[in-house]
Amino acid sequence: MFSRMCLRFPWLSPPFISPSTSRPEVLRSLLTGHKFRQLFSSRRRIKFSQGSIKFLQTLCRISVPGVPVRETQPPSKFLKDKKVVPQADPPSAEDVNHLYQLIDQSTKLVVLTGAGISTECGIPDYRSPNGAYSSGFKPITHQEFVRSSRARRRYWARSYAGWRRFTAAQPGAAHVALASLEQAGRINFMITQNVDRLHHRAGSNPLELHGTVYSVICLDCGFSFCRNLFQDEVKALNPKWAAAIESLDYGNAGSDKSFGMKQRPDGDIEIDEKFWEEDFHIPTCHKCNGVLKPDVVFFGDNVPKERADKAKEVARECDAFLVLGSSVMTMSAFQLVSFRILM
């Protein structure tokens, strides 16, 4: 079976994957469900996967010459208890074969990833049955953030509280598999809707369509700086708040519930108003004293033109477009897929 799989998947032959891993496992780590829809235009192919990635008990072990092997770890017990991974049937052999054919026959493959690719890492998505929207959560909009100091205070208080847990997430099997395929030359370009930087930590360098929570930007002068520095400034301005948050036992779900906490896809945490409403202070811009926000595209905002143009360019030039972990419900992603279909 091992030699047969090597012949069938020549681009996954050693040294790209160790003999301890079967070839179907590699492709299964990329699948986000058991149902595929394939759309054909006159010149292009687009393949969707529905559902969400399920964590593999037997992890893919992929290596590329000159690239260190990164160990992937299962989600923590706490994150498993939160049930952020939607239920999905395992991919069939037919599913794996469909994905193999798409990758094998393409020379300019573009991959678009969404929140579903990070659920097994402990970061929930929005639209699955267990996603953020299922509990009535409504993410902050750009308009709310800009016009309301109260909304900004609520956002930053929750985001500060959720930062330690959010940044503790590790890349999953799919992140690692995509990074290895990218470095092996099988993926021409990667675009992600996610703001969690898990692709980067796995070794990829995708275009971050919606930005990243790892940077903070001034709405007035455009100055940007590292989020960790912002966290330190919040701590200095709110020592009692910071001490209360840091004293929580993150391995004990009960202690989180005492603060009314629940992790969200964009890195913040749902938390009772009484814990942030009074006396929470937000840092201002170092250069102009302006309003700071995470360098992400909130709902109601537009993707920066340069970024959007780059995404459209690679979509226009690709010969195959693979969507993983996304329902393509946001306009920025929908436009890319629609753009491919109409060509």
Where are these regions (language model features)?
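Conserved catalytic core of sirtuin-type NAD+-dependent deacylases
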Residues: 2-343
